[in-house]
Regions:
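Polar/charged alpha-helical tracts
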Residues: 22, 27-28, 56, 107-110, ...
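Short, surface-exposed, charged loop/turn segments at secondary-structure junctions
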Residues: 56-67, 107-121, 143-144
Length: 165
């Protein structure tokens, strides 16, 4: 279902999980779980926040769609959706329809062609996406200090020719 390998680039150790786009399933793990403590494998794909320390309702701040539907159920205190249907930070998304993978500028999942209501579709928005930018390595190197002590940085890379993620 996936292959794993490790590489080093500019002093940073990269742990790479490669799979077909059809295997991707964005999910909301809530506060009761985290990726390490779950039965899932993958990466943290988006930004989120919690409105109260004692509730289980994260506000998802990027597009996050699985099976053609937003993965969450949150709203903010202005009753605006924070369920993965819209991006409030970042304005690009990667999406897969079951046969086509693409990327585009979008802040609402309904704007992604072939995603809404499609049981085979997924979409993930993000803040620092360099979609279609030939200089993406330079952009990432400027954004990430490889000498910092931060752990857990994650990224999604897609190959539109092979539908590999």
């Amino acid at each position: 279902m996936y292959t794993y390998h490790k590489a080093t680039e500019n002093g940073m150790t990269l742990h790479i999980i490669e799979t077909d786009a059809s295997n991707i399933r964005p999910a909301q793990l809530l506060k009761t779980s985290n990726l390490k403590g779950s039965n899932e494998y993958g990466i943290n794909g988006g930004w989120y926040t919690s409105t109260k320390p004692d509730d289980n309702n994260y506000n998802i701040l990027n597009i996050a769609v699985s099976g053609g539907r937003p993965v969450g159920g949150g709203v903010n205190n202005k009753n605006e959706p924070r369920d993965g249907s819209v991006s409030t930070v970042g304005k690009h998304a990667i999406f897969y329809t079951g046969s086509y993978m693409g990327y585009m500028e979008a802040t609402n999942y309904e704007d992604l062609p072939g995603v809404k209501g499609n049981s085979r579709a997924w979409a993930q928005g993000g803040v620092a996406m360099s979609l279609g930018n030939q200089n993406w390595v330079s952009v990432v190197n400027k954004a990430v200090d490889v000498n910092s002590d931060h752990e857990g940085l994650s990224a999604i890379v897609v190959n539109l020719d092979t539908n590999k993620v």
